[in-house]
Design a protein with these regions (language model features):
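C-terminal amphipathic helix plus adjacent low-complexity
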Residues: 153, 255, 317-400
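Hydrophobic, well-ordered secondary-structure elements that form the walls
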Residues: 284, 308, 338
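Acidic (Asp/Glu)-rich catalytic clusters
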Residues: 77-81
């Protein structure tokens, strides 16, 4: 079986995030197939136009070109020349779905893997008359990469961890609605508290971003990590709402969310209930780090007060939560519950995800041919050389 994964990356810092790399490379690692990758950032391939595959997967990084709102996603018409059954993986589906649907229809994408888990949201974002989809399958935005797993007995005991509360996030644009504000609010609330007896490593500063292996080391050095559900509560199908928000904030830079909501978002707020468990939750579980999370459903993966300490969104139970955080034995018990239950059942691994994509993407599991042409050897060689060049470029930028 031959699979082509089409992605888009300029090898910025995002490329070095574990969540991105593990998702992208999961097909090459876990599919029982010959898997080839093509980065549309480089250039189009005349040779590739003449090839055929059993399955063509448009990765979410490719679909993310919708964020430019300049039709970038629609400028890859040449990809339609490649023969094969097409599927797509989508994320951040609350934004510019019109362009996505136009792409899906033109390229005759048959199956979409979506982070939506509510039928009414799927119908809103992907109305049938705008695409040729046969089905939409709900998946998570990230999974557990087993190659990154350490056995529980090899992870740091909580007594040896130097940081009590750890968190990294950014100030999300208010255009995503009230739901998305939780990421920054939870950080600000904890930073506002006077906790001299606890060691905090909490930041919303982009300069404090942690990538790669260092991210897992930071998690393993912390007893507790904060978190919220990912998603948005506002639907912006063509990007026009985002433009209105930008214009309003340009003229009113100190405006609060309440003011923005009253003047711009009011009719759109609550139009969508797009929320999902964050890949960060799985990373915390993998390092046996106790999570303090806002109340939520977390894609029905986690159980409150068994797999995480629940913090009310209005922070009304913050005093009790702080008492639990100070209880080192309790935090380690919660973390271990999550590790044994979530890691132990193997239901949320990238192996399972890849199987979901392939089994739902293909019409049948028949025997397939293999493509061993010299083109792919040449293509892979050029790909790795290009990645290496970009890494050197980034290193030089930070050193010099």
């Amino acid at each position: 079986m031959d699979i082509l994964v089409i992605f888009h990356s300029n090898y910025s810092a995002t490329f070095f995030r574990n969540t991105f790399k593990d998702h992208l490379l999961s097909f090459g690692r876990h599919a029982d197939a010959e898997v080839y990758y093509f980065n549309t950032f480089i250039k189009e391939s005349n040779y590739l136009k003449r090839q055929s595959f059993d399955l063509i997967i448009y990765h979410y990084s490719f679909m993310a070109q919708k964020w430019s709102c300049n039709g970038a996603l629609l400028k890859h018409n040449w990809l339609k020349s490649i023969k094969g059954r097409r599927v797509a993986i989508a994320q951040d589906e609350y934004f510019n779905s019109n362009e996505v649907n136009e792409f899906l229809k033109y390229h005759d994408v048959k199956v979409l893997f979506s982070c939506c888990d509510r039928l009414q949201d799927i119908k809103l974002i992907y109305p049938k008359h705008l695409n040729n989809l046969e089905k939409v399958i709900s998946v998570l935005p990230g999974y557990i990469e087993t190659k990154n797993l350490k056995p529980l007995n090899r992870l740091k005991k909580h007594v040896n961890r130097k940081v009590d509360i750890f968190y990294r996030a950014r100030n999300n644009s208010m255009v995503l609605g009230k739901l998305s504000l939780g990421k920054s609010r939870i950080a600000k609330e904890f930073l506002f508290l006077e906790l001299p007896h606890l060691t905090l490593d909490i930041s919303l500063d982009p300069d404090d971003t942690i990538l790669g292996e260092q991210w897992f080391l930071s998690l393993e050095n912390a007893r507790v990590v904060l978190g919220v559900e990912g998603g948005a509560s506002v639907f912006d199908p063509d990007g026009s709402l985002s433009s209105r928000v930008d214009e309003y904030m340009k003229n009113n830079p100190e405006a609060s969310y309440s003011e923005l909501n009253e003047n711009v978002l009011k009719e759109s707020e609550g139009s969508l209930d797009y929320k999902t468990i964050s890949p960060r939750s799985f990373e915390a579980i993998m390092t046996n780090t106790c999570q303090v999370l806002h109340e939520g459903s977390y894609s029905s993966v986690l159980t409150p007060n068994k797999h995480y300490i629940q913090l009310n969104k209005d922070f009304s139970n913050i005093k009790n939560v702080l008492l639990l955080i100070e209880n080192q034995e309790y935090c380690e018990k919660i973390a271990t519950n999550a590790y044994r239950d979530i890691i132990g059942n193997n239901a949320h691994t990238y192996e399972k995800f890849v199987d979901i994509v392939i089994s739902n993407g293909l019409k049948s599991r028949r025997e397939f041919r293999h493509n061993n042409s010299r083109f792919w050897l040449k293509c892979q060689s050029k790909f790795h050389l290009y990645v290496f060049a970009q890494i050197i470029k980034i290193i030089r930028k930070y050193i010099y």
